[in-house]
Regions:
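Hydrophobic positions on the alpha-helical face of helix-turn-helix-like DNA-binding modules
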Residues: 1
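Hydrophobic/aromatic-lined pockets within catalytic cores
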Residues: 20, 24, 97, 117-121, ...
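Conserved beta-strand -> loop -> alpha-helix junction used to position metal-binding or nucleic-acid-contacting
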Residues: 103-110, 115-157
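RNase H-like nuclease fold core
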Residues: 4-106, 110, 114-118, 122, ...
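Acidic/histidine-rich catalytic cores and adjacent linkers
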Residues: 102, 120, 153-296
Length: 296
């Protein structure tokens, strides 16, 4: 970009510094372009949450109306902690007023799932199947020498392609057949040589057990989308963001976060008129911020 503009990289960096030091807050976007769920009374929608990690110790938390493909809120934190999540969800609940979502979808971190249920009592909660599939691939290696692992992986990899209740029932039947044949492996224990470890025993196939638990524990959360069509099976809250990551490589973390904030804000204000409104709001806030810095 510096070459195209005929200026040095240092000068270009200085020109952009004010934008990187004053990234747009979600409330600016709410003011410039209120989301669909607030402009149309009782509009049905599904809430989605995910985090985009920018290396160790920095994650951007993204909250979406996945039904209308609109980002509602964002923030950054050192981790996807309950405190950080609660700090975001409180203003979202206030701003959406009584228009609660029909369902939620997330990567199923226990504490965050609990807060969702407490925030919107009685809401359907769907576990993102892409995250489930990713965990299962890790626990059930493709080239495992254990036939039971290979067989369970073959069954598990169907999870993202189930479209009907009949598909779900066939999926459960396949799991039942697997269990009838390999149940003993789930209970198999390893007893170490005396004195080599403090542990008396452990499960021999711990990853196999974890994968089995994912597939059979709280199965309603895996398939809410089959009974409530407005809820998706996967969380696309970060759709379109990954393609921009390469442009931020080499920047300090705080600038990477700022660029992501701008990207999220501009994804909500796509027309020239909306961006003009956002620009006016941002200038007022940025000017006030600079004045405060000078005074202090």
């Amino acid at each position: 970009m510096a070459q195209a503009e005929g200026v040095s990289r240092a000068l270009l960096s200085r020109r952009f510094q004010v934008f990187l030091q004053n990234p747009p807050h979600p409330l600016m976007v709410w003011k410039a372009n209120p989301p669909t769920i607030t402009s149309v009374p009782r509009r049905l929608w599904t809430y989605g949450f995910d985090g985009k990690w920018l290396g160790r110790g920095c994650v951007v938390l993204i909250h979406r109306d996945v039904t209308h493909k609109e980002t509602l809120w964002w923030s950054d934190s050192m981790s996807e902690s309950i405190d950080a999540y609660t700090k975001d969800i409180t203003p979202i609940k206030h701003l959406t007023k009584d228009n609660h979502p029909v369902g939620t979808i997330s990567d199923w971190k226990p504490g965050i799932v609990r807060i969702m249920g407490e925030t919107w009592e009685g809401v359907y909660q769907q576990r993102c199947l892409v995250h489930v599939e990713r965990d299962l691939k890790r626990l059930l290696p493709l080239h495992s020498p254990i036939p039971a692992t290979q067989y369970l992986r073959e069954i598990a990899m169907r999870i993202c392609s189930l479209k009907t209740r009949a598909d779900r029932n066939h999926f459960f039947f396949s799991l039942l057949l697997w269990h009838n044949e390999y149940e003993s492996l789930l209970k198999e224990r390893t007893i170490p040589v005396f004195g080599t470890t403090k542990k008396r025993w452990w499960y021999t196939h711990s990853n196999l057990r974890r994968a089995w638990r994912i597939l059979t524990h709280d199965t309603d959360s895996l398939f809410e989308y089959l009974d409530v069509p407005i809820i998706p099976s996967t969380n696309n809250s970060l759709e379109g963001i990954n393609s921009h990551l390469a442009r931020r490589r080499g920047l300090p973390k705080e600038y990477q976060v700022a660029m992501m904030y701008w990207q999220l804000a501009l994804s909500r204000c796509k027309t020239p008129s909306l961006r003009k409104q956002l620009w006016g709001i941002w200038k007022q806030v940025a000017a006030a911020s600079q004045t405060t810095q000078i005074v202090t």
